[in-house]
């Protein structure tokens, strides 16, 4: 399991590293300024691997562009990052990321909970173009959360699972115990509702281990 610090400002990189993050996610859709300059600033502050993300409005972010526009935005930052988050709607542009030798986090975020059989199909679809499938859903009751835990345990690895919102915030700490590869946290300002800070998550893992 690796801790990802989702940054909403490049100045948070130092805090994330000092608190114990393993990777830094650059949420370009939440940042002001040129993505290349932002990535360079983070490289100057920290040597941790970087994830480039333009989270679409459809999946909880603030990016509204087409796949073609997404490709134009991601191309200049490829020399500076190690991973690229690619939603399914942008999957046909994954070739340029592969050609650059970067790893792909193939992601899907939904405000609903998906049935178990759909989760397994989705995992295969994401793995078809990505190295790490990332599936973030929204359980509405404990039974649905148990299904998500069961999927996480049974799915092919590596896989990343998580929850949207704060209703089942504690699942963010539980899912890595059942095999989720990445745990997304914040380093000052949450990039998503319900995120723990890196420091909080490190403390939780120590208590649960």
UniProtKB/Swiss-Prot annotation:
3-dehydroquinate binds at residues 6, 25-27, 55, 172, 195. GO terms for molecular function: 3-dehydroquinate dehydratase activity. The keyword Transit peptide does not apply. Its EC number is 4.2.1.10. It comes from the Archaea. Pathway: Metabolic intermediate biosynthesis; chorismate biosynthesis; chorismate from D-erythrose 4-phosphate and phosphoenolpyruvate: step 3/7. It catalyses: 3-dehydroquinate = 3-dehydroshikimate + H2O. Homodimer. Belongs to the type-I 3-dehydroquinase family. Involved in the third step of the chorismate pathway, which leads to the biosynthesis of aromatic amino acids. Catalyzes the cis-dehydration of 3-dehydroquinate (DHQ) and introduces the first double bond of the aromatic ring to yield 3-dehydroshikimate. This is 3-dehydroquinate dehydratase. It comes from Methanoregula boonei (strain DSM 21154 / JCM 14090 / 6A8). The lineage of its organism: Archaea, Methanobacteriati, Methanobacteriota, Stenosarchaea group, Methanomicrobia.
């Amino acid at each position: 399991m690796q801790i990802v610090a989702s940054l909403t400002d490049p100045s948070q990189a130092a805090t994330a590293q000092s608190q114990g993050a393993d990777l830094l996610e650059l949420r370009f859709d939440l940042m002001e300024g040129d993505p290349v300059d932002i990535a360079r600033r983070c490289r100057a502050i920290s040597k941790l691997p970087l994830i480039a993300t333009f989270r679409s409005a459809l999946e909880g972010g603030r990016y509204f562009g087409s796949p073609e526009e997404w490709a134009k935005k991601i191309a200049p930052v490829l020399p500076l990052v190690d991973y690229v988050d690619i939603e399914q709607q942008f999957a046909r542009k994954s070739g340029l990321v592969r050609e650059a030798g970067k790893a792909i986090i193939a992601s899907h975020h939904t405000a609903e909970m998906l049935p178990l059989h759909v989760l397994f199909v989705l995992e295969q679809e994401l793995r078809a173009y990505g190295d790490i499938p990332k599936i973030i859903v929204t359980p509405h009751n404990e039974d649905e959360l148990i299904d998500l835990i069961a999927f996480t345990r049974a799915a092919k690895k590596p896989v990343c699972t998580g929850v949207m919102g704060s209703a089942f915030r504690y699942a963010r700490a539980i899912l890595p115990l059942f095999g989720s590869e990445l745990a997304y946290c914040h380093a000052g300002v949450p990039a998503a509702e319900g995120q723990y800070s890196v420091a909080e998550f490190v403390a939780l893992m120590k208590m649960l281990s």
